[in-house]
């Protein structure tokens, strides 16, 4: 089983953590943008069927 020889430095840990956070932030931003466009009806990539409720 592979075992790391030396301890990972604090700066390297911080860099990796920030990259991971940045990826999550950009994905969340895209998801929010898509949800916003779907709710306003400006989406060009999704076709949402509108159902009318008759009372």
From Swiss-Prot:
GO terms for molecular function: structural constituent of ribosome. InterPro entries: Ribosomal_bL32, Ribosomal_bL32_plant/cyanobact, Ribosomal_zn-bd. GO terms for biological process: translation. It comes from the Eukaryota. HAMAP family: Ribosomal_bL32. Belongs to the bacterial ribosomal protein bL32 family. This is Large ribosomal subunit protein bL32c. The lineage of its organism: Eukaryota, Viridiplantae, Streptophyta, Embryophyta, Tracheophyta. The gene is rpl32.
